[in-house]
Amino acid sequence: MRSKVEILPSNLIFHELIGLEIKVINSTNPSLTGIRGRVINETKNMLVVENSQSRELKIPKADSEFLFRIPAELSEKGRRSDTFVKIQGNLLLSQPENRIKNIKKLRKWG
């Protein structure tokens, strides 16, 4: 099912992240760098990622850098391949529902 608002690199930080594939590409905790999996939960300060061994890992948003994969079917119309977006975790520090509300405000005024 397509979302009403397409997920673009420019608006990813306002979207629901649960279900997206992710890789930690940098972190102040070196043991977190390189972790990859699917986001299964999100809090104000953490992303919970399920890795390929079905293990749940809690990753702090602050001081981490992530690479998200946006599947082609959720991305721009006509796009035939997945899009990869690098995001500083500090930009995600907010309760998910508040971040999602902000895109609705932007659309209203944009």
Curated annotation (Swiss-Prot):
Does the record's keyword annotation contain Chaperone?
Answer: no
Q: What is its EC number?
A: 3.1.26.5
Residue stretches in coiled coil = none
Under the heading InterPro entries, the entry gives: RNase_P/MRP_Rpp29_sf, RNP1, Rof/RNase_P-like, Rpp29/RNP1
Q: Which GO terms describe its biological process?
A: tRNA 5'-leader removal
Q: Name one Pfam family in it.
A: RNase_P-MRP_p29
Q: Which GO terms describe its molecular function?
A: ribonuclease P activity; RNA binding
UniProt keyword annotations, A-Z: Cytoplasm, Endonuclease, Hydrolase, Nuclease, tRNA processing
Extract one GO cellular component term from the record. Answer: cytoplasm
Catalysed reactions, as listed in the record: Endonucleolytic cleavage of RNA, removing 5'-extranucleotides from tRNA precursor
Q: Which SMART domains match?
A: POP4
Which compartments is it annotated to reside in? Cytoplasm
Origin: domain of life: Archaea
Concerning its family, UniProt says: Belongs to the eukaryotic/archaeal RNase P protein component 1 family.
* Subunit details: Consists of a catalytic RNA component and at least 4-5 protein subunits.
Protein role = Part of ribonuclease P, a protein complex that generates mature tRNA molecules by cleaving their 5'-ends.
NCBIfam families hit by this protein: RNaseP1Mthb
Q: What is this protein called?
A: Ribonuclease P protein component 1
Which species is the source of this protein? Answer: Methanosarcina acetivorans (strain ATCC 35395 / DSM 2834 / JCM 12185 / C2A)
Q: Which gene encodes it?
A: rnp1
